Each structure stands twice: as structure tokens, then as C-alpha cells.
């Protein structure tokens, strides 16, 4: 991943998310950070990276609305497909970081649940469809006039990054193509 997307991912890892405690657990002290104590069934807000560790240890689980599911990916792909040409839909918050983690998790699950191969392959296919459809729209939008805030607000941070980079490249290329200097003759 390019450095900028890694930065966006870092921000996601350090954002606060909601979890639900699976069991009672005393507080956990880390260098400069205390998490918990946890009481079974109660909801807590913790950093995403801490939530992952708590989930892996079986202490807590993510709230359903904080995770991406196969149905969410299908809905996004369908929404992108039915958009009018030149229109781009708004993605759910933190869609790409959640998508990357969903794909990584389904890939890991294959080791212990081989029947999940099909689910993973379908998710990868849908993810590629989404990325390709949105990328085509972003390329078209970046090669035209500057877009309004109404259009730009529908971009994720990752998409705004590629939109801005493409816009600069296309503007520079266009200027070079149309520039004529006969002083060299």
C-alpha cells in the first residue's frame, strides 16, 4: 500500500469503536493506557486495534454495525452498478479499511473452515467490481473540470487521494501537450 493509504489505515486503527463484553474481565493496563474493567453484556468504546485484540482473546466482540458483512459488500456493489453514468454513490464510513479487514479475515478462516473458500472468492470478486467501477468514475471526474464539494464529499479519503493525484498528472500532461516552444529550432 502506498504510504498515504497506510496513514489512512493507521488513523482507522487508532479510531474509537464500540465493543460488547463477552465476559467479566479486570482492567488491562498497557503503557500509558488502561482498558476496562469489563462486565459481560456491557458496551464499551475502545481503540480499534485494542478491540481486535479483545475480540481475538474472546473477551469482547465488535458490535454488528461496526463490521462489514458479505451483504454490505453486495449492497455497495449493487448500488455502484445501478448509478447513472458519471454519478458516484457515497460509501459507508471507513468502507475500505473495513473491506481490507473483512477480506483478510475470510482468507484466514479458510485454514480452519475450507468451506469458506467460495465466500472469500465471492467477496474478492465483489470488492474488485466496486473498486474498478469507482476507479473508472474517479478517472473520468479527475480529467474534467474541478468537481463541486457535493461530488467530492462522496469520495472516501483513499479515493480523494487518487482523485487529487490524477488531477495533477492530467493537468500537467494537458499543459505539456498543448505547449509549443519553437525556440529550439
Can you say where each PLM-predicted feature lies in the sequence?
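Generic structural hydrophobic/aromatic packing signal, biased to beta-strands
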Residues: 19-21, 46, 62, 99, ...
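Phenylalanine-focused residue identity feature
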Residues: 10-12, 38, 48, 62, ...
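Charge/polar-rich, low-complexity and marginally structured segments
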Residues: 2-9, 67-185
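General secondary-structure edge motif
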Residues: 18, 33-35, 79, 107
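Short N-terminal secondary-structure initiator segments
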Residues: 13-15, 40-41, 47, 84-88
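Compact, well-ordered interaction domains used in eukaryotic information-processing assemblies
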Residues: 26-68
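N-terminal, Lys/Arg-enriched amphipathic/low-complexity engagement segments
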Residues: 1-27
